[in-house]
Amino acid sequence: MDDALPRHPDTTATLLLCGRFGDSREGLKPLSPSEFRDFARWLEARRIALGDLLHKDAKSIFRNYAKTAPLCERLGALLRRTDDLALARERWAGLDIWVVGQFDPGYPSRLRRRLGFAALPLLFGAGPRELLDGGGICVVGSRDSSPRGLEFSRLLGARCGREGMTVISSDMRGADREVVGAALANNGKVVCVLSDSLEKALAAKRYREPLAAGMMAFATPFSPEVNFKVANAIRANKYQYALSDIAVIVETRQTGGIWLGADENRNEGWVPALVRTDDVMPSGNLALLHLGLAPITRQDVKDCASVRDFFVQRALARGRGAADDRSAPAARPAGPHPLPPTATASFDLYAVFVAELRRFAATGPHSDAEIAAHFGLDIEQTRRWVSRAVAEGAVHATAAGVRAG
């Protein structure tokens, strides 16, 4: 498949500098994420594109950048790995694996916007890449989730599948695999973020049909053949949150990757998050409730008229609560890089609003008052967001009201 091949020169250069393929000679290591970040920023400051390294006098560029001769020689040797890259590209194409670099126009905009250089330089995957920019619900849970947690995952996945909400999770056994399977079984779409073994996942019989039907996409920031590492699993968590509109934590302890991912999302403010509550639940779930995450129960998922509307209402309600908290006088921790919580929360909630507005407008036209009632928003906030959505082309304003674009 041609789409598997890195067409953009920036991606080709990134692969040569950072990719792990071919026979690694001792002493020739691909750039680490931090090394690549520093080099990319240096190039950007001088208005040199990564792809220019394939055509211009790269040696002079390396000499200007590298502080030592060994580093200059290493950069040059990495760029000369074209034969090894050609073989790797041929292998990936045979498996329908695509790859994009951070500076490729085809790199998912949500990852670029939310993670920036916190993301790894390359993204591999398979299936329709456009699913990665379509948003959805991130669902994460423990490998050893309880029977109640697994039942909740199946129920949530089934409802998301039936109602057209993309599920963003992983192929990890337990809650993640259950929610993915239930969504696919109900004709839903899935984005599966992997921390290892993309090649093995593509060979799994359970995913062949949804991949062929365009109902599923895999994505991983790691080489397709890489084996499982705990550190990689923790690093992959942020991708699930960053690709989504809202997140649900099914089960977590107060340690481990699921906990760290939930805490990182809470600190970074990528998306609103809810945590499953029950009569009996893990200590991590209870701790997340105490930290301010919204609750979600099995009955909520089972009884709500629309799971999409339920999530929109919860996200907007938490956003209003956070805004109220921020309006009260409070001591601010000192630091060189304070977070801008207002802008972050506002953007994420607006993304949720627009996603639902498109669906609601398809049943229109609807007036601003009808939209405000549908979302439970005050009329002024509704008008601001509707005006922005119209300006961005997400919906159309007519004399009769707002219609789908």
Which stretches of residues belong to each language-model region?
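Helicase-primase coupling helices
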Residues: 40, 57-60
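Glycine-biased, small-residue-rich flexible motifs in mid-sequence functional cores and linkers
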Residues: 1-35, 44-47, 53-57, 76, ...
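Alpha-helical interaction/regulatory segments in DNA maintenance proteins
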Residues: 59-100
